[in-house]
């Protein structure tokens, strides 16, 4: 397996960096406790730490103080805060090489290169194209150099060929169906002022609005679009991975590059290995990259299935990172009780879990656990454990439609009382997504497209599991009482549905 370069680990953030809180972050106990991140956690601050956080939230920079810089790193790593960057065009040419792997598709390549007129170094890696002359002609017209691979080795091998030839500190990997717009690189490069950042990805958006129902669905729910909110990237985070379609990487961090034995999911594996090596990977939606989405039904469905086949390989390489559902034992027990016909027992389980979580949180906030009235610990516990159990319908429904439907459908046929609950759980996520996104597509076709999307992905998951002889990507991951983390702070139990699409 290709290895990433060893990262800086607990490198302090640069002095002078500015931070802003994530929209989900909150301060409690007169600023002495801060909550937020994904998964949610609670941090108890010292008095100097609380003063630093208050100053940062008001716009002050991180001072040249080791303890303050270490605290800022913790806030960034947990997702409680995000960097505020000074995005200005560099005075000279950026010291970055753009690498574009391509096999055939000269028209798409020409469109991609047209958006790179300001890039100083561009390498096109011809990965065994049938018409090499067409690729060479397009690249020459744009002033790009061409590296030829005699046989097709896949995207990982092509990217590695370009990586080996680049001699700049940064490399930007772009797929040939990307359409760069003005300023995309200028918005990403400031992240690398932090020596711990190994890679940054922009938001992938449709290059142009399509008219078909599938094009409109893709415009709102593409698996390449990781959303509107910035994030640290790692398994279990709000953004658990970023696609390799557009990715700027510190060459030192890239090491030997992508795993060439993976034809699908190699970009997810690469990003996760960067994180495991101590590098930080960030997602910044302030930078956008146009993309020509697949909008032909057969091609689109086949690609979804291909994505699913990578789940088994990724789970074997990164144990616990690709599961259909992540849940606390309390949440899982409450839903199981409700599913078998005992909603009252489920409510008791939820109440018990809320009380126990409040007791643990009170140890952090310094409150009296026995006095719930006005208690920040109880409010947070009710929101996370109580409210989280109710909100679990969404990821649970997604897990059923994206992974478990081959078992859920026979169960619904055999047991009549399961039909309505299962149907409600499966339909809830796409309907809620439609309400959130309000795409230019009616809810009936949007829900149908989403379910078709899920079926394609799940077929790939099951196929990959059969080929790799593992069931791990089919199993939920339950978290017990001990939620200790390498990131200091108390992790708050919750439930998420995660994994590469």
Where do the PLM segments sit?
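Short, flexible, basic/aromatic active-site loop/helix in glycosyltransferases
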Residues: 202, 218-239
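Glycine-rich, basic loop-to-helix element that forms the pyrophosphate-binding segment
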Residues: 149-166, 176, 182, 187, ...
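Acidic donor-binding/catalytic loop of UDP-sugar-dependent glycosyltransferases
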Residues: 107, 131-132, 178-191
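Conserved donor NDP-sugar-binding/catalytic core segment of glycosyltransferases
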Residues: 182-216, 292
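N-proximal low-complexity "stem/linker" segments adjacent to membrane-targeting elements
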Residues: 3-19, 25-115
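Acidic donor-binding segment of Leloir-type glycosyltransferases
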Residues: 113-148
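Short aromatic/hydrophobic "clamp" motif used to bind/position activated sugar donors
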Residues: 171
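A short, conserved alpha-helix in the catalytic core of glycosyltransferases
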Residues: 243-249, 253-288
């Amino acid at each position: 397996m290709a290895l990433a370069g060893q990262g800086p680990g607990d490198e302090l953030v640069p002095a002078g960096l500015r931070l802003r809180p994530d929209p989900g972050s909150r301060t409690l106990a007169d600023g002495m406790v801060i909550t937020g991140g994904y998964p949610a956690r609670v941090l108890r601050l010292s008095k100097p730490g609380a003063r630093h956080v208050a100053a940062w939230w008001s716009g002050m920079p991180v001072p040249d103080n080791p303890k303050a810089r270490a605290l800022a790193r913790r806030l960034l790593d947990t997702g409680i805060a995000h960097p505020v960057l000074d995005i200005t065009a560099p005075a000279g040419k950026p010291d970055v090489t753009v690498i574009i792997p391509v096999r055939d598709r000269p028209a798409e390549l020409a469109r991609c290169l047209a958006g790179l007129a300001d890039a100083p170094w561009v390498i096109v890696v011809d990965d065994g194209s049938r018409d090499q002359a067409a690729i060479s002609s397009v690249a020459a017209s744009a002033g790009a150099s061409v590296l030829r691979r005699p046989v097709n080795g896949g995207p990982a091998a092509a990217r590695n060929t370009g990586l080996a030839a680049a001699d700049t500190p940064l490399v930007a990997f772009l797929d040939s169906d990307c359409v760069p717009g003005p300023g995309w690189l200028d918005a990403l490069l400031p992240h690398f002022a932090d020596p711990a950042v190994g890679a940054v990805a922009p938001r992938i958006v449709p290059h142009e609005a399509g008219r078909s129902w599938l094009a409109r669905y893709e415009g709102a729910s593409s698996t390449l679009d990781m959303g509107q909110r910035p994030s640290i990237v790692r398994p279990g985070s709000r953004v658990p991975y970023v696609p390799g379609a557009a990715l700027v990487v510190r060459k030192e961090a890239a090491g030997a590059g992508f795993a060439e034995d993976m034809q699908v999911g190699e970009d997810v594996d690469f990003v996760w290995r960067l994180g495991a090596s101590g590098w930080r990977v960030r997602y910044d939606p302030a930078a956008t990259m146009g993309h020509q989405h697949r909008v032909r039904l057969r091609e689109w469905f086949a690609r979804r299935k291909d994505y699913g086949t990578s789940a088994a390989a990724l789970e074997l390489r990164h144990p616990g990172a690709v599961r259909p559902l992540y849940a606390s034992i309390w949440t899982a027990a409450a839903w199981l009780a409700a599913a078998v016909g005992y909603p009252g027992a489920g409510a008791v389980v939820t109440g018990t879990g809320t009380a126990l979580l409040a007791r643990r949180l009170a140890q952090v906030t310094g409150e009296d656990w026995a006095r719930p009235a006005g208690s920040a610990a109880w409010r947070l516990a009710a929101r996370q454990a109580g409210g989280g159990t109710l909100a679990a319908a969404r990821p649970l429904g997604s897990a059923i439609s994206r992974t478990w439907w081959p078992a859920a459908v026979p169960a619904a046929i055999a047991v009549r009382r399961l039909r309505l609950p299962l149907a409600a759980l499966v339909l809830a996520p796409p309907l809620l997504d439609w309400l959130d996104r309000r795409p230019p597509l009616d809810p009936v076709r949007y829900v149908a497209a989403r379910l078709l999307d899920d079926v394609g992905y799940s077929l790939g998951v099951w196929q990959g599991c059969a080929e790799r002889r593992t069931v791990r990507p089919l199993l939920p991951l339950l978290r017990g009482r001990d939620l200790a983390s390498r990131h200091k702070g108390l992790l708050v139990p919750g439930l998420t549905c995660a994994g590469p699409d």
